From Swiss-Prot:
Domains (record comment): Ig-like 1 domain is indispensable for synaptogenic activity whereas Ig-like 2 domain is secondarily responsible for the activity.
Entry keywords, A to Z: Cell membrane, Disulfide bond, Glycoprotein, GPI-anchor, Immunoglobulin domain, Lipoprotein, Membrane, Postsynaptic cell membrane, Repeat, Signal, Synapse
Protein name (record): Immunoglobulin superfamily member 21
Keyword set includes Iron: no
Signal peptide: 1-24
GO biological process, one term: synapse maturation
GO cellular component terms, A-Z: external side of plasma membrane; inhibitory synapse; postsynaptic density membrane; presynaptic membrane
Family matches, as Gene3D superfamilies: Immunoglobulins (2.60.40.10)
Cysteine pairs bridged by disulfides in the record: C46-C116
Self-association state and partner proteins as the record states: Interacts (Ig-like 1 domain) with NRXN2 (via Laminin G-like 1 domain) in a trans-interaction manner.
Functional description taken from the UniProt entry: Involved in synaptic inhibition in the brain. Selectively regulates inhibitory presynaptic differentiation through interacting with presynaptic NRXN2.
Length: 468
């Protein structure tokens, strides 16, 4: 009687073994893959062991968090046929052998989980199929496609008497995963103070560098401020700030000093006097990163480098933004050189202006490569512009219907960026217009005088006659 339970257990184990033999033996696994680079060929290999007859192999791509399984390849052993479900991919897969699928040119959109399902016949009946599956996550990387370095808050003016902050923005797009971005100055890595990211609502704008103003504020010495204000007052006595020639060395010419608290600064082409309270020591750099996911799975990274600008040492400094990414064999980089504008090239059309013509004066280049983008201000020396304004901001100055009174007038173009300022002058020569008799044009270049009066009287008489 006591042997009965043991006998029953042995019978159950024997029955289970018989059922296992009837179903057949099947194990499935997919060989792991390291991250792959977009554009490379990828082989998904499904290994399985069985002592039964194979029914089919089906490959699935899993999307939407596992809720959707899309067939990408089927092998049907019953009919010994291969069938592709990847019409949209135009049969991008190649069957190497029964359990392997090859993607010759993988894309970022191929990133995600895949499953291999293998079915064998049940030994007891061919109506049943025993299934087993394996899965793998295909991690597709993509190197950055573009890199660009721009200046925030550009264009911006040159400041003589107040130190100002400057921000370089490195924009790296198209990478997956997000790359590592850092800056160098003159080939040497910059040891910057890292800052936490701003909220997503503000981190995407290049213009948003204002939060650094309080971080980089420098205390201004009262004595130096008074001296600077005295210089400013001296310059404005003539009605407009003078410009000054840049020194060829850090030591200024003693002949320029009239007295200890003032300077006599003659007006010249190039203007560049630097804030006296900007220290010559190494600047303190601050670095901030922001990341914006793209709809295609890539990430746009923006690195913002901010410091207190010192035109004396920062002018002609080479800054480079470098990118490291696992999909790149060597760093990717973009370079900019901070340069103050020098020698604007002025073009005037028409080349021979006549009374009544519309004259355009345009800045179409510099003697050097300028960065960041400069801003332009036009003024008329000794008088106001034709429209009555004191100055005009823009690259092109338009004078409509120029009168003869503008002959010989001088125009000043001030081009400036945070590194410096330069003035260029051009004189307008206005020739007589044979279509407009001398003395018949007004200050806007339109016809007036006796001829205009006679024409008005004729029109008035015509109207009176028609009314009577």
């Amino acid at each position: 009687m006591r042997a009965a339970p043991s006998l029953r257990r042995a019978s159950c184990l024997l029955l289970a073994a018989i059922l296992d033999l009837a179903r057949g033996y099947l194990t499935v696994n997919i060989e792991p893959l390291p991250p792959v680079v977009a554009g490379d060929a990828v082989t998904l290999k499904c290994n399985f062991k069985t002592d039964g007859r194979m029914r089919e192999i089906v490959w699935y791509r899993v999307t939407d968090g596992g809720t959707i399984k899309q067939k990408i390849f089927t092998f049907d052993a019953m009919f010994s046929t291969n069938y592709s479900h990847m019409e949209n991919y135009r049969k991008r897969e190649d069957l190497v052998y029964q359990s392997t699928v090859r993607l010759p040119e993988v894309r970022i959109s191929d990133n995600g989980p895949y499953e291999c399902h293998v079915g064998i016949y049940d030994r007891a009946t061919r109506e049943k199929v025993v299934l087993a599956s394996g899965n793998i996550f295909l991690n597709v990387m993509a190197p950055p496609t573009s890199i660009e370095v721009v200046a925030a808050d550009s264009p911006a003016p040159f400041s003589r008497y107040q130190a100002q902050n400057f921000t370089l923005v490195c924009i790296v797009s198209g990478g997956k995963p997000a790359p590592m971005v850092y800056f160098k100055r003159d080939g040497e890595p910059i040891d910057a103070v890292p800052l936490t990211e701003l909220p997503a609502s503000s981190s995407g704008s290049v213009q948003d560098s204002r939060p650094f103003r309080s971080l980089l504020h420098r205390d201004v010495d009262d004595t130096k401020m008074q001296k600077s204000l005295s210089l400013l007052d001296t310059e404005y006595r003539a009605g407009r700030p003078y410009t000054e020639r840049p020194s060829r060395s850090l030591t200024q010419d003693p002949n320029l000093f009239v007295q200890p608290t003032t300077e006599n600064i003659p007006e010249t082409v190039v203007s560049r006097e630097f804030p006296r309270w900007v220290h010559s020591a190494e600047p303190v750099y601050f670095l901030r990163h922001s990341r914006t996911p793209g709809s295609d799975g890539t990430v746009e990274v923006r690195a913002l480098l901010t410091w207190t600008l010192n035109p004396q040492i920062d002018n002609e400094a080479l800054f480079s933004c470098e990118v490291k990414h696992p999909a790149l064999s060597m760093p990717m980089q973009a370079e900019v050189t901070l340069v103050a504008p020098k020698g604007p090239k002025i073009m005037m059309t028409p080349s021979r202006a006549r009374v009544g013509d519309t004259v355009r004066i345009l800045v179409h280049g510099f003697q050097n490569e300028v960065f960041p983008e400069p801003m332009f201000t036009w003024t008329r020396v000794g008088s106001r512009l034709l429209d009555g304004s004191a100055e005009f901001d823009g690259k092109e100055l338009v004078l409509e219907r120029v009168p003869a009174e503008l002959n010989g007038s001088m125009y000043r173009c001030t081009a400036q960026n945070p590194l410096g300022s330069t003035d260029t002058h051009t004189r307008l020569i206005v020739f007589e217009n044979p279509n407009i008799p001398r003395g018949t044009e007004d200050s806007r270049g339109s016809a007036s005088g006796p001829t205009g009066v006679r024409l008005t009287l004729v029109l008035a008489l015509t109207v009176i006659l028609e009314l009577t």
